[in-house]
């Protein structure tokens, strides 16, 4: 689960991090009032969406008067902001952040942290190249990025934070301030079950003070049950409607941009299915894992969610029967196809527990379902069926 910039900043501020102050506005009049309360002569209007690249997309603008603040806010609120991180539809802007202007600054730095799956520990990354996408820095000048891994048994140690501070070119009192900042960021990360935090840019102001000008936080969705305050910050408007509906039925769904819908049990098998569709010249429209305990109701809902995507021209169902029996899945598929009134080609590949019986049920049913033997056969058949449709 992602947080908005203003939510991330308020959370980080509660851990002692210096942030760029701002006020949320839901309309032009509120933006004008927020401008009047801004301590600087110039304010920054920031569209609040769960996506990066807002500045280049016109979602971050400087304003010098309350009238201009109102005008800019009204031009953003109620629209969809399209950035390099969104799809073609963009993300809805429901409110803006009216923030103090912290520029000019001496320099812009980068500080971020993620859960490193290789070491299973929190790893901090830092760079002197702040204010730009860290992916671009990693590609063009990887030597300017350095990292440290934190031992969870002892936590972030002061000498580690000082080491990072010195590598960032900080000196004197800035080092002590940075140690406090980085320690607070780590504490916030662990206590709130983050899976990602990014402060970009971390500015060194003209007076030498540090400030978090922007902040991104991703929270581990699997830990939300023990983070009720964080869960309450969830903004469903920033998520795909089909993904939200899938979550209601415990279906793992991620919308993609292809035309072949996928329904699979197991995340690994789902990824392999998408890969082989691509290999045979098709484009997957989604990732959908119905889980090991697939039932008729879940299969029906999965069909509905897949077919709500108007770009879907065919569906590939790939089921490995382990705990769940393939004959039961076959019955659920037949019932679901009838109930949902599926009009696009459907290819089904069953393997494992009672696979032969499941295939027989499909072949003897009165619905148009194409049976496949093996993963390659299934991928070839769905790609051919979509092309022929």
From Swiss-Prot:
Gene Ontology MF terms in the entry: ATP binding; magnesium ion binding; succinate-CoA ligase (ADP-forming) activity; succinate-CoA ligase (GDP-forming) activity
Residues noted as binding substrate in the record, renumbered to the chain: 265, 322-324
GO CC terms, sorted: cytosol; succinate-CoA ligase complex
Cofactor note: Binds 1 Mg(2+) ion per subunit.
Binding-site list for ATP: 46, 53-55, 100, 103, 108
Residues reported in the UniProt entry to bind Mg(2+): 200, 214
UniProt entry keywords in alphabetical sequence: ATP-binding, Ligase, Magnesium, Metal-binding, Nucleotide-binding, Tricarboxylic acid cycle
Catalytic activity from the UniProt record: succinate + ATP + CoA = succinyl-CoA + ADP + phosphate; GTP + succinate + CoA = succinyl-CoA + GDP + phosphate
Involved pathway(s): Carbohydrate metabolism; tricarboxylic acid cycle; succinate from succinyl-CoA (ligase route): step 1/1
EC number(s) stated in the UniProt entry for this protein: 6.2.1.5
Domain spans labelled ATP-grasp: 9-245
Stated role: Succinyl-CoA synthetase functions in the citric acid cycle (TCA), coupling the hydrolysis of succinyl-CoA to the synthesis of either ATP or GTP and thus represents the only step of substrate-level phosphorylation in the TCA. The beta subunit provides nucleotide specificity of the enzyme and binds the substrate succinate, while the binding sites for coenzyme A and phosphate are found in the alpha subunit.
Complex and partners: Heterotetramer of two alpha and two beta subunits.
Annotated protein name in UniProt: Succinate--CoA ligase [ADP-forming] subunit beta
Source organism (scientific name): Psychrobacter sp. (strain PRwf-1)
GN (gene name): sucC
């Amino acid at each position: 689960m992602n947080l908005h910039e203003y939510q991330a900043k308020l959370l980080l501020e509660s851990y002692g991090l210096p942030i760029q102050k701002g006020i949320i506005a839901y309309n032009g009049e509120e933006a004008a009032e927020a401008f009047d309360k801004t301590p600087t002569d110039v304010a920054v209007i920031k569209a609040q969406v769960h996506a990066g690249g807002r500045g280049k997309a016109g979602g971050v603008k400087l304003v010098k008067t309350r009238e201009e603040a109102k005008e800019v806010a009204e031009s953003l609120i109620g629209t969809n902001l399209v950035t390099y991180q969104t799809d073609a539809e963009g993300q809805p802007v429901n409110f803006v952040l009216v923030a103090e202007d912290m520029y000019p600054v001496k320099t812009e730095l980068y500080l971020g942290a993620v859960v490193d799956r290789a070491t299973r520990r929190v790893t901090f990354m830092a760079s002197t190249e702040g204010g730009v996408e860290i992916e671009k820095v990693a590609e063009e000048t990887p030597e300017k990025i350095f990292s440290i891994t934190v031992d969870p048994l002892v936590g972030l140690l002061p000498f580690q934070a000082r080491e990072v501070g010195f590598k960032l070119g900080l000196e004197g009192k800035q080092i002590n301030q940075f140690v406090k900042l980085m320690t607070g960021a780590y504490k916030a990360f662990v206590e709130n079950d983050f899976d990602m935090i990014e402060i970009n840019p971390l500015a060194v102001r003209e007076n030498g003070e540090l400030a978090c000008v922007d902040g991104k936080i991703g929270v581990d969705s699997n830990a939300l049950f023990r983070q009720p305050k964080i869960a309450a910050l969830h903004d469903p408007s920033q998520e795909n409607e089909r993904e939200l509906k899938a979550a209601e039925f415990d279906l793992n769904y991620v919308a993609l941009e292809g035309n072949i819908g996928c329904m699979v049990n197991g995340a690994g098998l789902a990824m392999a299915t998408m890969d082989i569709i691509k290999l045979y010249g098709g484009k997957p429209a989604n990732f959908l894992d119905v889980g090991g305990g697939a039932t008729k109701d879940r299969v029906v809902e999965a069909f509905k969610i897949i077919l709500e995507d108007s770009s879907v021209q065919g569906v590939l169902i790939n089921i490995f029967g382990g705990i769940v029996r393939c004959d039961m899945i076959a019955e659920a598929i037949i019932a679901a196809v009838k109930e949902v009134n599926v009009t696009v080609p459907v290819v089904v590949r069953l393997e494992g527990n009672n696979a032969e019986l499941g295939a027989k049920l499909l072949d003897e049913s009165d619905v148009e379902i194409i049976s496949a033997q093996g993963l390659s056969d299934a991928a070839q058949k769905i790609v051919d069926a979509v092309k022929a449709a």
